[in-house]
């Protein structure tokens, strides 16, 4: 069978032919499992590094994808024998290179190539580029940051770089679906899972925030890519939830003996290398597409009822 015939068969059998970058990561692996279970779309795991223009171009020419998805991002890493599980890793000496390469250059390069090749591009970005202010009051579920809002949080190298990436994705625009997630949550213990993180911290700074329950949202991501939806979306569950509220549910459904201790933002800042983003993202745009999306408190409660340690 020649290559042309093979490609015709693929397009007839599958709705999407997806080239996935960042497939080795926690979220990338979840997407792969979803695509396998749906058995509706063909997917190819990228072998080229996303920061290598010529190799990526070569792979696109060979694979001929209908869609590219990027789950590339740098939020943690290892230096010597020390494991950094948070964005404080990017504040260490010499890590500005990793930050810019993985959180800006690579996804923007993919976005530009997708425009050039007229390929739909799904970019999983972040909403950790905002913070409460006078126009967006603390712990209030009105006047949240919208998809049109520009970043106003510059307290960490991570958020600064990702904020510029977010703005560049808007400028490239044509074929790009830019999804802003926050504090991702699933129903299984994992060092990247926000529930796992806060249940292992010595002290908790409890702040109401927008958050993303991936168990509910990732199927929507695939559906949006399949329907070639473009633009920026705040990709969080509607509403606000605090660390303490999550831990109270954890204690109720998962571990009745669990205890924790709180401390203030000021006390937290003394032990962190960088500040943390706290905000409320307006989700009306996403809710118009998916009106059945659960409120964050309901979604987290459902997660806790089936939580796997």
Say what each PLM segment does.
Residues 220, 224-273, 277-278:
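Mid/C-terminal beta-alpha module of Rossmann-like enzyme folds, strongest
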Residues 52-104:
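NAD(P)H-binding glycine-rich loop region in Rossmannoid oxidoreductase-like domains
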Residues 155, 167-216, 223:
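NAD(P)-dependent short-chain dehydrogenase/reductase
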Residues 21, 71-72, 121-127, 179-181:
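SDR active-site strand-loop-helix element
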Residues 105-109, 120, 164-165, 213:
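Conserved cofactor-binding/catalytic machinery of classical short-chain dehydrogenase/reductase
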Residues 92-106, 128-179, 186:
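Catalytic helix-loop patch of NAD(P)-dependent Rossmann-fold dehydrogenases
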Residues 18-34:
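N-terminal Rossmann NAD(P)H-binding glycine-rich loop of SDR-like oxidoreductase domains
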Residues 294-309:
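Amphipathic terminal alpha-helices
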């Amino acid at each position: 069978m020649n290559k042309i015939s093979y490609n015709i068969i693929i397009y007839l059998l599958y709705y999407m032919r997806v080239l996935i970058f960042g497939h080795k990561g926690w979220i990338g692996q979840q997407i792969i499992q979803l695509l396998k279970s749906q058995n509706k779309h063909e997917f190819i795991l990228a072998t080229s590094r996303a920061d290598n223009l010529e190799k990526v171009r070569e792979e696109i020419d060979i694979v001929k994808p209908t869609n590219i998805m990027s789950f590339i991002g740098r939020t943690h890493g290892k230096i010597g024998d020390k494991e950094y599980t948070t964005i404080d890793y990017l504040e260490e000496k010499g890590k500005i290179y990793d930050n810019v390469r993985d959180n800006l250059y690579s996804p923007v390069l993919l976005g530009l190539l997708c425009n050039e090749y007229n390929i739909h591009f799904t970019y999983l970005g972040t909403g950790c580029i905002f913070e409460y202010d006078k126009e967006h009051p603390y712990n209030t579920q009105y006047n949240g940051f919208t998809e049109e809002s520009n970043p106003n949080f510059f307290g960490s190298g991570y958020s600064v770089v990702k904020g510029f990436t977010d703005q560049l994705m808007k400028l490239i625009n044509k074929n790009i679906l830019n999804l802003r997630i926050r504090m991702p949550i699933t129903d299984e213990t994992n060092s990247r899972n926000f529930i796992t993180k806060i249940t292992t911290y010595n002290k908790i700074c409890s702040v109401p925030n927008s958050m993303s329950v991936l168990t509910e949202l990732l199927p929507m991501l695939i559906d949006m890519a399949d329907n070639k939806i473009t633009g920026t979306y705040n990709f969080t569950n509607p509403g606000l939830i605090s660390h303490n509220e999550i831990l109270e549910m954890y204690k109720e459904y998962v571990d009745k003996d669990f205890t924790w201790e709180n401390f203030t933002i000021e006390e937290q800042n003394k032990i962190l290398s960088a500040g943390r983003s706290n905000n409320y993202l307006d989700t009306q745009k996403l809710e118009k597409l998916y009106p059945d999306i659960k409120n964050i408190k309901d979604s987290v409660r459902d997660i806790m009822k089936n939580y796997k340690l």
